Amino acid sequence: MPAIEVGRLCVKTRGREAGRKCVIVEIIDDNFVLITGPKDVSGVKRRRANINHIEVLPEKINIQPGASDEEVKKALEEAGLLDFMRERVRIELKPGLL
């Protein structure tokens, strides 16, 4: 099972959207992926993200690479994951980062 793949759910661990869940929409290169919340579901805008700034979750939805926000939202509804996506995750800071 590859960890970074299209349709995989993940949590942003850095930046202003830290703790919010998102979906990998497209793999750009070895270091970056295109993610989306969609914004009206979890608050994450469609944007490029470094793979070191996301934490992959075991859940996966079936979408095509480059899927629109509407297609992602529909796939989340079909999988029954809309409420799961709206929940935030608490990011624990390591003592060295304080």
From Swiss-Prot:
NCBIfam families, per this entry?
PRK04333.1
Which GO cellular component terms are attached? cytosolic large ribosomal subunit
**Record-linked InterPro entries:** KOW, Rib_uL2_dom2, Ribosomal_eL14, Ribosomal_eL14_arc, Ribosomal_eL14_KOW, Translation_prot_SH3-like_sf
A Pfam family the protein falls into: KOW
A GO molecular-function descriptor? RNA binding
Provenance organism: Hyperthermus butylicus (strain DSM 5456 / JCM 9403 / PLM1-5)
Which controlled-vocabulary keywords does the entry list?
Answer: Ribonucleoprotein, Ribosomal protein
The reply on keyword Ribosomal protein is yes
GO biological process per UniProt: ribosomal large subunit biogenesis; translation
CDD domains tied to this protein: KOW_RPL14
Q: Which residues form a coiled coil?
A: none
Which family does the record assign? Belongs to the eukaryotic ribosomal protein eL14 family.
User: What is the protein name stated in its UniProt record?
Assistant: Large ribosomal subunit protein eL14
